Amino acid sequence: MRHRVGGWKLGRNTEHRRALLRNLVTSLIVEERIETTVPKAKAMRPHVEKMITLGKQGNVAARRQAAAYLMTSEAVDKLFNTISPRFGDREGGYLRIVRTGFRPGDGGEKAFIELLGSEKIIDEKREKRAAARAKRAEDNRKALEAQQAQAEAETTGETKA
């Protein structure tokens, strides 16, 4: 009997589950917000908490432990330089899981998992993208007007000749 045996199996063998969780943790640290299923979000929560706690220690040994778990050096740098200082005075509870509904294909429950305090950063990224998109649309509109003016000038020039 497996009474009170903890952990999430997620329908995978040990190596696959470990790789999945490492990838999810790395993605969350880099992106600060990801969408996944609720069981995966719940399974990765303790791993992210441990990584942030390592980041708060800030010594070489902690950096090496984090580098051994995380998939990219970019994630390690962001963990130690950006994320951990944000939670300097907080003892745990660094994440928020927000349920977003069910997946149409198989009915799996989806959720966003995000670092607390990342709302401002995500909003800044969204505003920056919107500004870039608006600038690109304006440039395209000006280029189209210039093309239309040039085509109109060519057609009026042909009728005079």
UniProtKB/Swiss-Prot annotation:
GO terms for biological process: translation. InterPro entries: Ribosomal_bL17, Ribosomal_bL17_CS, Ribosomal_bL17_sf. Residues 132-161 are annotated as: Disordered. The keyword Heme does not apply. Residues 145-161 have a biased composition (Low complexity). GO terms for molecular function: structural constituent of ribosome. The keyword Ribonucleoprotein applies. Residues 132-144 have a biased composition (Basic and acidic residues). Transmembrane segments: none annotated. GO terms for cellular component: cytosolic large ribosomal subunit. Keywords: Ribonucleoprotein, Ribosomal protein. Part of the 50S ribosomal subunit. Contacts protein L32. Belongs to the bacterial ribosomal protein bL17 family. This is Large ribosomal subunit protein bL17. The gene is rplQ.
